[in-house]
Amino acid sequence: MSGNGAQGTKFRISLGLPVGAIMNCADNSGARNLYIIAVKGSGSRLNRLPAASLGDMVMATVKKGKPELRKKVMPAIVVRQAKSWRRRDGVFLYFEDNAGVIANPKGEMKGSAITGPVGKECADLWPRVASNSGVVV
């Protein structure tokens, strides 16, 4: 789950993005959408599909976008998920789409800006994502 650039620990969040899910790319790197092929740090039950949630680092490929970004495996961080989850204070919330940003293994973003809101859980865990985001919810 957490790479070199992650800080702190994460409260359990409902897993909303299994391997094979396609999410929007929320940064200005030139990618349009990302296809999840693996979840970092996901140890799970035998034969269970690994799944990611808000703030997780995943390995992804670009399905639509600039040709130089396509057909390569790269790390990405999930910044929004459509599956509802519960915060420690009892509030349930969810976003209208699934979105992620392309990063390097240390958690530094490839793009320089994030479009749309970013979950607080993700911003707390990844400082570089928090500094590039406009709205943290």
UniProtKB/Swiss-Prot annotation:
Pfam families: Ribosomal_L14. Keywords: Acetylation, Cytoplasm, Methylation, Ribonucleoprotein, Ribosomal protein. It comes from the Eukaryota. Its main location: cytoplasm. One of its GO terms (molecular function) is large ribosomal subunit rRNA binding. Transmembrane segments: none annotated. The modification N-acetylserine is found at residue 2. The keyword Mitochondrion does not apply. It is found in: Cytoplasm. GO terms for biological process: cytoplasmic translation. One of its GO terms (cellular component) is cytosol. Methylated by RKM1 at 2 different sites, but it is unclear which are the 2 methylated residues among Lys-40, Lys-106 and/or Lys-110. The modification N6,N6-dimethyllysine is found at residues 106, 110. InterPro entries: Ribosomal_uL14, Ribosomal_uL14_CS, Ribosomal_uL14_sf. The keyword Cytoplasm applies. Component of the ribosome, a large ribonucleoprotein complex responsible for the synthesis of proteins in the cell. The small ribosomal subunit (SSU) binds messenger RNAs (mRNAs) and translates the encoded message by selecting cognate aminoacyl-transfer RNA (tRNA) molecules. The large subunit (LSU) contains the ribosomal catalytic site termed the peptidyl transferase center (PTC), which catalyzes the formation of peptide bonds, thereby polymerizing the amino acids delivered by tRNAs into a polypeptide chain. HAMAP family: Ribosomal_uL14. Component of the large ribosomal subunit (LSU). Mature yeast ribosomes consist of a small (40S) and a large (60S) subunit. The 40S small subunit contains 1 molecule of ribosomal RNA (18S rRNA) and 33 different proteins (encoded by 57 genes). The large 60S subunit contains 3 rRNA molecules (25S, 5.8S and 5S rRNA) and 46 different proteins (encoded by 81 genes). There are 2 genes for uL14 in yeast. Belongs to the universal ribosomal protein uL14 family. This is Large ribosomal subunit protein uL14A. It comes from Saccharomyces cerevisiae (strain ATCC 204508 / S288c). The lineage of its organism: Eukaryota, Fungi, Dikarya, Ascomycota, Saccharomycotina.
